[in-house]
Amino acid sequence: LPIGQLFRDIAVAISVSVIVSVIISITVIPALASQFIKDAKHFDQQPRIPIIDTVASGFKGLVLAYGRKVVKSTWLGLTVVFALIASSLVVLVIMMPPLDYLPDGNRNFVFGRISVPPGYTREATLNFAQSMEDVARPLWEQSNPERLPHIDRFFFVAYNGGAFAGAATEDAGRIRELIPVLAEPVSKSPGARAFVTQASLFGRSVGGSRGILIDVLGPDFETVEPAFRLIRRQVGELFPRKAGHQVRVRPSENAVSPELVVRPNPDALARAGVSARDFAQALDVYNDGILVREIPLGGELVELVLTTQTRETAKIEDIEDIPVIARDGSLVKVGQLAEVSIESAPNQLLRKAGRRVVTIQLRLHESIPLETAIAEINSKVVFPFNIDSEDGVRLELSGAADDLSRAWDAVQANVILAIAVIYLLLVVLLRSFALPMIILITVPIAATGGILGLALLNLVMDQPLDMLTMLGFIILSGVVVNNAILMVEQTLWHIQHDGMGSVDAILEATSNRIRPIFMSTLTSLFGLLPLIIFPGAGSELYRGIGIVVFGGLLLSTLLVLFFIPPLMAILMRRFKSQEPIGDMTQEITAPLSQTA
């Protein structure tokens, strides 16, 4: 899956940057600090920022007053914690948007497949090229009154049964405006269909990462044909073209050519004493010839082919007059042994798992999430058809529908694995199985913040919950625990090294850690703002990640000050008579957070 490589590349970039920042913080930062921070008294009298400092002092006082109440009352603390967690989970379930696979990106290229009516010659198909070129020509010659984008490149290729075309614009941001321009000339021709889309950065076909494939499988084409026509009509009614959706059939139902069919008559063959194999070989001799053997000639193997002198000049009408030698040595004509007819047949035959298949390709408009469309197709088309089908015809979904299912399973597994690794790491560092559970409660709260941020962004612009956006939740699981770690570790420090009681240690840790928590969080939030606000190439790919991390980090930072103190107090009362929680070894002389 393309999403796997994307996840890996982003994960490597983040991991390397974190490792480098840690190395810099323990080597370069202390050296620079020793040179620039020589007079500690200078930092005791810092200028006040009128409004910000007043708000910050008031907020700190509010948090400490709240902390004094909840750490002294077990029931109040449990009520607050339960309310926060329950409300977060409810919001997470209710506001969880439908899933999407991958964004198409903003690639500067539109591509269209054109299906023409049966019987169109290549020359007739070229008329579509002329009509498209007539529409596109003003867009590459000079400015046009309708202010459509200028075309930088344009091509058209025609063949028997169809054609395809493509174009690119000088302004990559306006490439979508060419889709109706190129599709309009084709839509005016009776029986012709155009499937014009912007090329996807990740899609493997014309449908891109939003293309749903409905495979109609059956034993033969005669059985599949009425089924796929029914399904195509149902899909067209659910997702009409006027709403921006596009539907095409593969292989094209119009891509047919005349075919000469010879059906042997078993009774006539038996009377003449000719087997079906001998009859077929006789036809091959007059058609392309049959290979007798390969003989060496001049150091090479040369094919010895049995054919006739009239092979190149024979006409279709002459097939019935081809002589076949009967068992008694007499000559019998093909027309006496078989029925010869000219019929229409598809140019392409597709099979899946050994069965004939016709694929209906649905390209969704950007306004409908992929998960919503899949659910609607399954409930209204696939499931009812498969239940009622009695002739061996089945429907299967593939394409982006299958990719989304596999990617979603992988993302869920990655989130669980990430949380498990974080938990085990915290167990080793804190020497406790309970304290890491307190820290990890920030993860679902942060996920709620990410969903709320995504909902707010959708009020301004469309941003689906695609798999790239889901990567933001995986990143959150490793980022939002930092603030909780600061508070828990600082509380343990006050208990073990300053001899404080649990209540005083919790309140002191809350007071000490508010400033570094908000310093680190605000720098991260402002660093994410350009990713969310500013447009540009690639912004549609990573805007979802930015808003999820932004919303999750903001909400978890605000709420961590409200549920960590009561949880710590409850846990410490529970183990009051036991060995201190998180008994760190004496080798740790000072917590890393003390330097924050």
What is each model feature region?
Residues I94, A124-G208, R233, D267-V285:
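Solvent-exposed, membrane-proximal periplasmic/extracellular interface segments of envelope transport
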Residues L1-L6, L78, F82-Y120, T197, ...:
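Transmembrane helices with small-residue packing motifs
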